[in-house]
Curated annotation (Swiss-Prot):
Signal peptide start and end residues: none
EC number: 4.1.1.23
Subunit comment: Homodimer.
Origin species: Brucella canis (strain ATCC 23365 / NCTC 10854 / RM-666)
Active-site residues (renumbered): K69
Pathway: Pyrimidine metabolism; UMP biosynthesis via de novo pathway; UMP from orotate: step 2/2
Catalytic activity line of the entry: orotidine 5'-phosphate + H(+) = UMP + CO2
Encoding gene (name): pyrF
Positions annotated to bind substrate: 18, 40, 67-76, 122, 183, 192, 213
Lineage of the organism: Bacteria, Pseudomonadati, Pseudomonadota, Alphaproteobacteria, Hyphomicrobiales
Coiled-coil annotated residue ranges, if any: none
Enzyme class: lyase
Designated name of the protein: Orotidine 5'-phosphate decarboxylase
Length: 238
């Protein structure tokens, strides 16, 4: 398993295809053209034929982040990861539980699949964690899971950019830190609670930024993507 961190902004911006149909996803990709090279596919699109669409994106020389947030018994995780590795996608998420991560890392060994451990969803805050039965606050739990992901040999983690600086200090320079909840200045937060602008996220130590609604929901999607890329390039590599 390798972790490819891009200096070029176009390789660090991941557009979330959070749309209901393959036809709409195809339209987004067509409109964005060569401006975007990396796409995230999650549950909504997976259940509408998104796995085949992921393969078509790979065939078109695009990179794919398959956001499945896997969590199961070790053997089931391993068998699933083995098949995902054969698809040619670049990234796959699973929840950052030590046994699951160790099984996934072993299953992906020898492939180019970058495994990402999901720490705490960016839609959750401390009150949500307490309601779910966790005694740790968000930052404490994120750092704990980030260290566990590093120890398990994962390629990176998914976390809010709010915690990115602390994570980078904890795990060093080589792990990918993939940050959802990215909102350009003036954008609506939507259902995200721990958000940051693209520039601030990169300054904090994020390696990849996941942006969905601010691009996919924009009247001019390509212009929105190019504006974010311009902001990212103005910062350079953190």
């Amino acid at each position: 398993m390798t972790t490819e961190l891009h200096d070029d902004a176009s390789g660090r911006l991941i557009v979330g295809l959070d749309v209901p149909t393959i036809a709409e996803a195809e339209k987004v990709v067509e409109e964005l053209g060569n401006a975007v090279s990396f796409y995230k596919i999650g549950y909504q699109l997976v259940f509408a034929g998104g796995l085949d669409f992921a393969k078509s994106l790979v065939a078109a020389r695009k990179k794919v982040f398959l956001d499945m947030k896997l969590l199961d018994i070790d053997n089931t995780i391993a068998k699933g990861v083995e098949n995902v590795a054969k698809m040619g996608v670049s990234m796959l998420t699973l929840h950052a539980y030590p046994k699951a991560m160790r099984a996934a890392v072993e299953a992906a060994r020898g492939s180019d699949l970058c495994l990402l451990g999901v720490t705490v969803l960016t839609s959750m805050d401390n009150a949500d964690l307490r309601e779910a039965g966790y005694s740790d606050n968000a930052e404490t739990l994120v750092l704990k899971r980030a260290r566990q992901a590093h120890e398990a040999g994962m390629g990176g983690i998914v976390a809010s950019a709010v915690e990115a600086q602390a994570i980078r200090q904890a795990v060093g320079p080589d792990m990918a830190i993939v940050t959802p909840g990215i909102r350009p200045a003036g954008s609506e937060k939507g259902d995200q609670k721990r958000v940051m602008t693209p520039a601030d996220a990169l300054r904090a130590g994020a390696s990849h930024l996941v942006v969905a609604r601010p691009i996919v929901g924009a009247p001019d999607r390509k212009a929105a993507a190019l504006a974010i890329l311009k902001e990212m390039r103005s910062i350079g590599r953190s």
